[in-house]
């Protein structure tokens, strides 16, 4: 069920993704992989408050996650959820705990800084991102996200540019 949630989320069939995600969560609400998958779906479908709570729960259940060598992925997920729900300070708090940020975690941090009118810090982070990922364009990374409401994606892209 968790995998069907992920697959349907990728193809933007949010109704089916939620069906399988909720089913998986109801069957095993303490499996961090299930909690994370369902939490990500909720963040992408305009229920960021609940989704971020689940992402934090997944981090607390298993900070490192199966196959990972550190907690950076889970922390990045929480940063992203915090940004989407509008808790920019929480995003920055979790940023202090992360080691190497993935592009979406960078986008969440940079968009949060812009939302908090911290332009100098935003510019500094944009330069750090470009140095860390010289071949990536942040807007293109945001385009890879599967938001149900595309205005959320566009707002994020506008804030990081």
Question: Which ranges hold each PLM region?
Answer:
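Alpha-helical protein-protein interaction modules
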Residues: 5-8, 13-161
